[in-house]
């Protein structure tokens, strides 16, 4: 059983990496203003060497291009919710996202 530690900022990410957690979620939603910016994942990963830590990019992922971009900057997995729940064809949306990998 693993624990997923969620971070939002560079400071939080640095502290979590020092503590050697193996599973880290980078939330792309700014909790102060609720704005979503998927480049938050890239910013944090550029600042620190993730080593063997598995990175899950969370929030703001709406399609295959987002997944391809996040994968290219170092994310290992993705948490997708809203875009799947808002689509009329959930099966097609999940398939589209899956094949982006």
PLM region spans:
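Small/polar loops that bind or transfer phosphate-bearing groups
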Residues: 4-5, 58-59, 82, 86
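C-terminal helical cap(s) of enzyme catalytic domains, especially alpha/beta-barrels
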Residues: 43-47, 71, 86-101
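Catalytic cores of alpha/beta
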Residues: 9-20, 52, 57-80, 92-97
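Short capping/connector residues at structural and topological boundaries
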Residues: 36-39, 66, 89-90
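A short, acidic, amphipathic alpha-helical segment used as a generic capping/interface helix at domain edges
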Residues: 41, 45, 63-64
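Glycine-rich phosphate-binding active-site loops on the catalytic face of alpha/beta enzymes
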Residues: 25-34, 73-94
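Conserved anion-binding
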Residues: 1-43, 50
């Amino acid at each position: 059983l693993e624990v997923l530690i969620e971070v939002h900022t560079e400071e939080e990410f640095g502290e979590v990496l020092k503590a050697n957690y193996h599973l880290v979620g980078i939330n792309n939603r700014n909790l102060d203003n609720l704005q979503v910016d998927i480049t938050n994942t890239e910013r944090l990963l550029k600042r620190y060497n993730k080593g063997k830590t598995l990175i899950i990019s969370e929030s703001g992922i709406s399609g295959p291009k987002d997944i391809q971009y996040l994968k290219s900057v170092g994310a290992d997995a993705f948490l997708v919710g809203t875009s799947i729940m808002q689509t009329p064809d959930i099966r097609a949306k999940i398939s589209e996202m899956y094949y982006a990998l």
